[in-house]
């Protein structure tokens, strides 16, 4: 197996600032992102946002741990890079685009190299299932989280 990644987008019925508020609060991600089981902040920036975080994820064949550094370029981009962990490398980002009329396009991208040993476990149907959870499903999860928290 090579890299596990790709990108996926969805349109959210909420203004950019509401979507950014959810994306920016990285420590709540396990509440709404499937397979992401735990996050704990190791460092914060001057605004109190988590910048270095330990994560634990269930990728179906193994639980993987990582230390990730976040970069905030709000309200349109949140990116992260693995500093150390079970995967060889991980980089990802949320990119938000204001569509006007109270709508936002959210694009999730991920580029992860599981490395040789873990890569041997993530093949075929397991690879497809992992990609479905960790890439393709993310924008829909964000949409449900944001739209579900809006007063109706």
Where are these regions (language model features)?
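A structural signal for short, well-ordered beta-strand segments
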Residues: 8-12, 55, 94, 108-110
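Hydrophobic ligand-binding cavity/cleft-lining segments
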Residues: 1-48, 152
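Glycine-rich portal/gate segments that line the openings of hydrophobic small-molecule binding cavities
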Residues: 30, 40-84, 136-152
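Short, surface-exposed coil-to-beta transition loops
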Residues: 5-7, 63-67, 88-93
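Short loop/turn positions at the edges of beta-strands in beta-sheet-rich folds
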Residues: 12, 33, 72-74, 84-86, ...
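Short strand-connecting beta-turns/loops that link adjacent beta-strands
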Residues: 15, 46-47, 75, 99-103
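Beta-strand/loop substructures that line and gate deep hydrophobic ligand-binding cavities in soluble
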Residues: 81-136
